[in-house]
């Protein structure tokens, strides 16, 4: 089971995505990110890695097609339920979000 919350920065960034970008992010989260997070191992295509110079913050790529790559930053949080995982979504957008993850 996965629980999550979003920082205001994530919610603000989300408003700047196109409907297509928003749909792509949701699709990747539902079909790949959540199952991989629950399994404890991420597939290579998500490109999950630590953000440099930002301890505890990770990034994933949710779009690698034409145009700028879609990125989202997140961090693990305290589980709300025994055996559950909890994350906090921090930012979403292009590579530029990594300047202030």
Segments (PLM) and residue ranges:
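Arg/Lys-rich, positively charged N-terminal/basic patches that mediate binding to nucleic acids
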Residues: 1-32
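Residues that form or immediately flank small-molecule/cofactor binding pockets and catalytic motifs
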Residues: 9, 53, 94
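Enriched for short, Lys/Arg-rich terminal
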Residues: 12-16, 61-101
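A general structural signal marking secondary-structure boundaries and capping sites
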Residues: 21, 32, 36-40, 101
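A short beta-strand-loop micro-motif that forms or neighbors metal/cofactor-
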Residues: 25-32, 36, 45, 82, ...
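A short, surface-exposed loop/turn module that caps and links secondary-structure elements
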Residues: 34-64
């Amino acid at each position: 089971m996965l629980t999550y919350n979003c920082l205001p920065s994530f919610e603000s960034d989300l408003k700047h995505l196109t409907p297509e970008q928003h749909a792509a992010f949701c699709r990747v989260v539902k079909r790949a990110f959540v199952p991989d997070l629950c399994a404890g191992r991420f597939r290579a295509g998500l490109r999950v890695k630590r953000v440099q110079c930002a301890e505890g913050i990770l990034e994933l790529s949710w779009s690698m097609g034409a145009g700028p790559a879609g990125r989202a930053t997140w961090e693990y949080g305290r589980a709300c339920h025994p055996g559950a995982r909890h994350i906090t979504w921090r930012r979403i957008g292009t590579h530029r979000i990594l300047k202030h993850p």
